[in-house]
Amino acid sequence: MGINFEVSRPKAGSDTNMSNTFHTIGLIGKPNHEGTNLTLKRLHHWLTMQGYSVLVEERVASDVGSHTHSVDLLEIGANCDLAIVVGGDGNMLGAARVLARFDIAVIGVNRGNLGFLTDLPPDTFEEALSKVLEGEFDTEQRFLLEAEVHRHGELKSSNTAVNEAVLHPGKIAHMIEFEVYIDDKFMYSQRADGMIVSTPTGSTAYSLSAGGAILTPNLEAMILVPMFPHTLSCRPIVVDACSIIKLVVSPHNGDNLEVSCDGHVNLSVLPGDEIIVKRSADTLRLIHPKGHNYFHVLRTKLGWGSKLF
């Protein structure tokens, strides 16, 4: 059901500092987190004083104040021009899986650890955010994955992932058997603890920890990374982003298998199931302050060496 906002758009000729780029801004954050709450309150006050219409995601609205417009994440996607996510990369991933289906720009304020997807500093966001709101920003289109579980020829469950879809055992780690097909062409059979199918966005996350290569965000590619394969010759492989990945689970496996999407959503998998992982039709419109340098982010977050000369 739609919502009617009395201050959703500025009147022509009104006295405001707003640019024509963004008018209605959604605030999303990590619930029950003291640092996030402080930043959300500052953001809400600052944006309101600038003349913007501000909507606050319902899980954090009460922490921001009783005077806020509280809405769910879908309403932020449908009604806002810009979403600001306060938290870590995990919070950004959760919001992005929903917001990617809408025509909305997304930017992050880092209240987490690494913060590959959250650029703005929590204590001094005003200067950088002011320039973004004036239209000075860089845009990246990040594609998502769609993971499907098929059983006896029928679709049983599905979900989307920004980072990765992972086939793995349930609560107890053990080796599983499965076959891997790329565009219906058999690639290999595998005995391993699982398989990671990652986007370029996810290549600095779980995939990296499992020995996968880093893919720059603009690459139209996916990377498949076996988890603890029972062979010395099996290595990660990069395939075209339009490829359709099929994992066929051996009927001899135990019944406690899952497919995890970004580590947040788990799809149950039974022996004999087929998992299809493909590019989603949804795309996340991630924006950064002007001059954003991906390699500077990598160097800073991963502790790479600085320039020697």
From Swiss-Prot:
Required cofactor names: a divalent metal cation
Organism placement in taxonomy: Bacteria, Pseudomonadati, Pseudomonadota, Gammaproteobacteria, Alteromonadales
GO cellular component: cytoplasm
Residues given in the record as NAD(+) binding sites: D89, G90, N163, E164, H174, R191, D193, T204, A205, Y206, S207, L208, S209
Top-level taxon: Bacteria
Catalytic activity: NAD(+) + ATP = ADP + NADP(+) + H(+)
Gene Ontology terms describing biological process: NAD metabolic process; NADP biosynthetic process
Alphabetically ordered keywords of this record: ATP-binding, Cytoplasm, Kinase, NAD, NADP, Nucleotide-binding, Transferase
Family label: Belongs to the NAD kinase family.
Function: Involved in the regulation of the intracellular balance of NAD and NADP, and is a key enzyme in the biosynthesis of NADP. Catalyzes specifically the phosphorylation on 2'-hydroxyl of the adenosine moiety of NAD to yield NADP.
Database matches in InterPro entries: ATP-NAD_kinase_N (IPR017438), ATP-NAD_kinase_PpnK-typ_C (IPR017437), NAD/diacylglycerol_kinase_sf (IPR016064), NADK (IPR002504)
Catalytic residues as annotated in Swiss-Prot or TrEMBL: D89 (proton acceptor)
Name recorded for this polypeptide: NAD kinase
Keyword Kinase: yes
GO molecular function: ATP binding; metal ion binding; NAD binding; NAD+ kinase activity
Biological source species: Shewanella piezotolerans (strain WP3 / JCM 13877)
Class of enzymatic activity (EC top level): transferase
EC number: 2.7.1.23
Any one Pfam family match given in the protein's UniProt record, by short name: NAD_kinase
Bilayer-spanning residue ranges: none
Cellular location(s): Cytoplasm
Disulfide bonds, paired cysteine numbers: none
